[in-house]
Amino acid sequence: MSEVKLTPEQNEAIHSSGKNILVSASAGSGKTFVMAQRIVEKVKQGIEIDRLFISTFTKKAASELRMRLERDLKKARQESSDDEEAHRLTLALQNLSNADIGTMDSFTQKLTKANFNRVNIDPNFRILADQTESDLIRQEVFEQLVESYLSADESLNISKDKFEKLIKNFSKDRNILGFQKVVYTIYRFASATENPISWLENQFLKGFETYKSLTDLSEDFTVNVKENLLTFFELLENSLTNGVIAKKGAGRDKANLILDNKNELLEAISKKDFVTCTALFLSIDTDIRVGSSKDEALSALKKDFSAQKQDLVGSKSKPGELRKFVDKIKHGQLIEKYQNQAFEIASDLQKFIIDFYKTYLERKKNENAFEYSDIAHFAIEILEENPDIRENLREHYDEIMIDEYQDTSHTQERMLELLSNGHNLFMVGDIKQSIYGFRLADPGLFLEKYKSYDQAENPNQLIRLKENFRSRGEVLNFTNDIFKHLMDEKLGEMTYGKEEALVQGNISDYPVEAEKDFYPELLLYKENTSEEEIEDSEVKISDGEIKGAAQEIKKLIEYGVEPKDIAILVRSKSNNNKIEDILLSYDIPVVLDEGRVDFLKSMEVLIMLDVLRAIDNPLYDLSLVAMLRSPLFGFNEDELTRISVQGSRDLRFWDKILLSLKKEGKNPELINLSLEQKLKAFNQKFTEWRKLVNKIPIHRLLWKIYTETYYFDYVGALKNGEMRQANLQALSVRAESYESSGYKGLFKFVRLINKFMEQNNDLASVNIKLPQNAVRVMTFHKSKGLEFDYVFLMNLQSRFNDRDLKEDVILSREHGLGMKYIADLKAEPDVITDFPYALVKMETFPYMVNKDLKQRAALSEEMRVLYVAFTRAKKKLYLVGKIKDTDKKAGLELYDAATLEGKILSDKFRNSSRGFQHWILALQNATKLPMKLNVYTKDELETEKLEFTSQPDFKKLVEESEKFDNIMSFSDEIKEAQKIMNYQYPHQAATELSSIQTPSQVKKRSYEKQLQVGEVQPVSEFVRVKNLDFSDFGPKKITAAEMGSATHSFMQYADFSQADLFSFQATLDEMGFDEKIKNQIDITKILTLFDTEFGQFLSENVDKTVKEAPFSMLRTDEFAKEQYIVRGICDGFVKLADKIILFDYKTDRFTNVSAISEIKERYKDQMNLYSEALQKAYHVNQIDKYLILLGGPRKVFVEKIDD
């Protein structure tokens, strides 16, 4: 292997020491490589690896760094000729598993557990990692605290009347959800500070103390209006001289009058004399009309004048920037009158928040369960209050190394300060990739060091890694051209200059000269009026955008590009369902990294929630009927109507079922034998489930329902079956988490879920296996750190999310609370109304200041998000957006006015929430970017669409959980049905046959038919048959079904090409299993598979392996003589040139190898079914079938099944 040639900057980053070092590592510059090599060099110099503190942003990054270090340390040891150095490297390898390599959260947990007595907590605390549990506890604390304050408890520091005013300021119509949202927002923000109580007590009201009037606002409040005024005056002066404004007439007089007041207006702004400023502006007439001209050049100037005047001044109905400023002044003058009342509300809010924070923390101490932020605060307290511990750690660690430093929070920064000796920090990151502001990371921490370390007098060191070893020059040049004109100190928080620009470092891989075929491509879908309107404020994506991208992807695949080398990046996962469906219709394999959206609204979960609601309360008609109509019981509308007419319309449906069973209803003759048997079977199961509610945990009950009704198998056989099954598993996990938190009872669980749905909340997505060769769809944020040959950025026209700028509170670290205040203007002399009150919600001065700060920070972060997205592409970048064909200003004409101010795009276009497409098109017009632009329509899509066989749509196989508001009504047609009720259908067997069956159902049906014809079924002496008594299950016991499902999921995730302990453990950690399940998955045992010849074969043929392979096949039932579809999923197969190697995992437990023959016999029919499906699908005659037995003693057994 050839020696890697280091750049001078990389070499410096690896070997420099004795000072704090900040490595600004641009995208693709090899920062992980540099960090690993620096650690290896430290070990060579004699520093033990456990004396290095190495903090990573995620657990995955820590695991990957460990694996990389293991490889690099081994390589260094092999190449070392120094025995002492080799010994040091060997020692480092031995201690690698114990080295402090991990997230800051993992370190603070370890520190807190080791010093629990210093903060008076139990060392056996657990982490509230499950959002459901922390939400439950927080909600209970909040509700109890609100109840206390409303009870007029005199011991509290807010009176009942004042507390009611506080709630009303943030909530509507006696609903406290608005107030609750405010409290949770402040709590989350405070928790990200290094000392929440201190911040709440000392900084929370700082804005109200600082900004009491308009004149207290900083220069930022007036800087834009000064610039706009100067621009307006210059426009008028130029227009008076170039003939745009006529030499005589009213227009010229108005312009001269405005210019006569020029100096007075500017002076009033400078002095913050807002009364004079407003009066002057309102006194002058800005309605200057210039008409048109036959002269083409003059006409263009007149048109430009009108456009600029509209932007700068506007009209009363459509104000421009100057009129908006005057409105802000008038608003400010009004809020000054209510400043004291607003401050009183803010003070009471501060008291309540502090009380809530302390009460919630005390509750968590009682539960001995904490959030990550709590543990971080405990760790800070330990180090601050205990110099002995702090100094011991400072002496222990030779160096403090931090990866992804740009995403550091103030809490983490405080930890680093306490651990460092002042000159041993090694920080690696890229300010241009700081995109986690929503997690309260502060890029300002990196930026302050970036600027100060660059000063000659600063003893610390800044090292820039600029070379990009990932991407072609076309991608890098385009990225540089965008950001050098987009970012500056004012907006972007830094200048994107020569030192920040990306430099191509992989000259040997890619040519230096640009090739037009690899220019980034902007694909704009021109949507016509017959299609859905573009939603300016939403991130909705149109079919046309996705189809345009799909056709380009299809071409790439035809040219030989592997699907796994293509990624689609989206703003949010809300469009995932639509993207997946359309790509599949083009026969493009696709995987959604973050799953399909709306877990709680997925068909299978909705059905199970209705089942739980019905079990909890069978008198709830909607859920009961929905359950009956679902695939679990399969009652059709005719049958439900027959039941419905057994009683009056106001009688509960459950009572009608009981009447039907007893044949005591109004129309008992309608309950035929078939329906009666169906009702009895339902009632038996349903009654049993209801009896078990108080005997077994909810998650056990769910699994009993899944298995008894074959519903788990059923949804697994549908389209997206794996995701559906994962959703059902997730519902069970949520139920278990709920109960493990100390909460009991189905009623409360159903209430919790209902509350989530009422608030349009969702539960966390579920982890499923990722196909190895498929186009990946993920959010921009999720893509950080990854790379793909071809990258498609979708939905670029969507607006930036500016909802945070409209919330009732906006917070900042410096100024604390900014809030809106609801004032009753009835007392104002200018307000005339017949209503008893005139409530107006207005922005306080601290709110205005925080809003301005947040808006600039948000736009700066959006720029960085775009930078991250661009730099994922290795070879080519595709940008996909949409324009209208009706409104000219929404099309490309709007960008004719885009210009540069110096080297930067004008603020008119930069300082906008209209989205990435708005920036790119503006820059395209202003600078002519090195990219290709293609506009296409729906008609062009249809004519150019590649003809491929679409996958069948199986969605109709299962209907949504329906709500039958009218099912209870009587139908006259039912009486006609009586005439045919006794008709005997000649193909009764076919009516009992499901049109779609899973392999398990086929196997069960075959077994039942064999019993009917009189065959005796032998029971193996090695297989003990018993009836499971669910009432005996303890809350912590794991069922075989759950373990089997978890083990199968792990085998689907595991990368067989990296079959080692580190890799498999990392995979297991990522899958999010419950700890009890995770601890029972024996990775060491699973790895014995790869000691076998078959395991080695799998490792060597990963590229030919298809895991989790779905199939469907038409078969004929020998008894019903009818055809039916078998759909299922086999665990995997390897497709070779002349044959297919089929394999399936089995987790059946056995202790004696003599039981293997019985297991093989048990699954022979199932494997033959899979084999038959593969033969028909691939037209291959030879299918070798193997069972991988994971449940045996000590190791994995591989057994071939003979025909």
From Swiss-Prot:
Q: Give a yes or no for keyword DNA repair in this entry.
A: yes
E.C. no: 3.1.-.-, 5.6.2.4
Cellular component (GO) terms are: cytosol; DNA helicase complex
The UvrD-like helicase C-terminal domain is annotated at 503-785
Catalyzed reactions per annotation: Couples ATP hydrolysis with the unwinding of duplex DNA by translocating in the 3'-5' direction; ATP + H2O = ADP + phosphate + H(+)
Any Gene Ontology biological process: double-strand break repair via homologous recombination
Q: What happens when the gene is disrupted?
A: Cells lacking this gene have an increased sensitivity to UV and about 300-fold reduced chromosomal conjugational transfer.
Positions of the UvrD-like helicase ATP-binding domain: 4-472
Residues annotated as binding ATP? 25-32
Q: Output the Pfam families linked to this UniProt entry.
A: UvrD-helicase, UvrD_C
* Role, per record: The heterodimer acts both as an ATP-dependent DNA helicase and an ATP-dependent, dual-direction single-stranded exonuclease. Recognizes the L.lactis chi site (5'-GCGCGTG-3'), which stimulates homologous recombination. The RexA (AddA) nuclease domain is required for chi fragment generation; this subunit has 3'->5' exonuclease activity and probably also performs the helicase function.
Q: Which family does it belong to?
A: Belongs to the helicase family. AddA subfamily.
> Could you identify this protein by its name?
Exonuclease/helicase subunit RexA
Species the sequence originates in: Lactococcus lactis subsp. cremoris (strain MG1363)
